[in-house]
A protein has these predicted regions:
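Conserved acidic donor-binding segment of nucleotide-sugar-dependent glycosyltransferases
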Residues: 98
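PIN-domain endoribonuclease scaffold, especially VapC-family toxins
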Residues: 1-75, 89-93
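Short, polar loop motifs at secondary-structure junctions
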Residues: 82-86
């Protein structure tokens, strides 16, 4: 799991507007924190740079956080597991929707 994912989950807890949502998000964050987060290293940074250029060349957009999560997945050769629709279709990026 990317450190960016941890940050997004934590922000989701902080942004919750009701206790039910907060508790559900906190449960997800707590489970995620049991995993060792993948740091942003040189390999992830290189994949991020290539991804940004590929997106630009194809006229596609991706949020900054999503692009770091995608770069982490590319560096590890694993799919992105998401509930988010922010990942454009790219041959090199495998995306699984939960």
């Amino acid at each position: 799991m990317s450190v960016i994912t941890i940050a997004e989950l934590r922000a989701g807890v902080l942004a919750a507007t009701d206790l039910t949502t907060r508790d559900r998000r906190l449960h997800t964050l707590t489970a995620a924190l049991e995993l060792d987060p993948v740091p942003i290293d040189t390999s992830v940074a290189n994949h991020w740079a290539k991804l940004r250029v590929a997106l630009r060349d194809r006229g596609l957009r991706m949020g900054v956080n999503d692009s770091w999560i995608a770069a982490t997945a590319l560096a590890l050769d694993i799919p992105v597991l998401t509930q988010d629709d922010g990942f454009p279709t790219l041959d090199e990026l495998r995306v699984l929707h939960a």
